[in-house]
Amino acid sequence: MNPRRKKRLTLAVALIGGVAAIASLLLYALNSNLNLFYTPSEIVNGKTDTGVKPDVGQRIRVGGMVTVGSMVRDPDSLHVQFAVHDSLGGEILVTYDDLLPDLFREGQGIVAQGVLTAEGKLEATEVLAKHDENYMPPEVAEAMGQKHEKLDYSQQKAPDTK
């Protein structure tokens, strides 16, 4: 092989190796920032199409309805624990150590983002609450499908307490 051809081959191999290294670093960075969406039933039973369950320590997003009566606040800190359920009967405990959104209430839809622990709890780093009675996060609406049950409110007014 003459020196000119050898120099071109070395340059081509180095260029291909550099592109491969950059591509692998890019894919690694994207993979570490990937947050997969799960419903409580999918965390317990696995995804319906693949049966894949999230791994302990994996960063995920969970969407569903806050279970009425499940919220427990620590009186000395911002720590709060509540359960999130879906229409298929799955339920997961969520712990959060920050201020909850103003619109957060039991019985309403939320999306919590955080890390799954070994006990099957979600240590949330962010909690998003729905905005009004008609809004539901797209992932939650799609996952719950037609089985979402709205709360019924009567037109009867509360008695005057004055």
UniProtKB/Swiss-Prot annotation:
Residues 153-162 have a biased composition (Polar residues). InterPro entries: CcmE, CcmE-like_sf, NA-bd_OB-fold. Keywords: Cell inner membrane, Cell membrane, Cytochrome c-type biogenesis, Heme, Iron, Membrane, Metal-binding, Signal-anchor, Transmembrane, Transmembrane helix. Heme binds at H131, Y135. Residues 1-8 are cytoplasmic. Residues 139-162 are annotated as: Disordered. GO terms for molecular function: heme binding; metal ion binding. It is a single-pass type II membrane protein. The chain crosses the membrane at residues 9-29. It is found in: Cell inner membrane. SUPFAM superfamilies: Heme chaperone CcmE. GO terms for cellular component: plasma membrane. GO terms for biological process: cytochrome complex assembly. Residues 30-162 are periplasmic. The keyword Cell membrane applies. NCBIfam families: PRK13165.1, PRK13254.1-3. Belongs to the CcmE/CycJ family. Heme chaperone required for the biogenesis of c-type cytochromes. Transiently binds heme delivered by CcmC and transfers the heme to apo-cytochromes in a process facilitated by CcmF and CcmH. This is Cytochrome c-type biogenesis protein CcmE. The lineage of its organism: Bacteria, Pseudomonadati, Pseudomonadota, Gammaproteobacteria, Alteromonadales. The gene is ccmE.
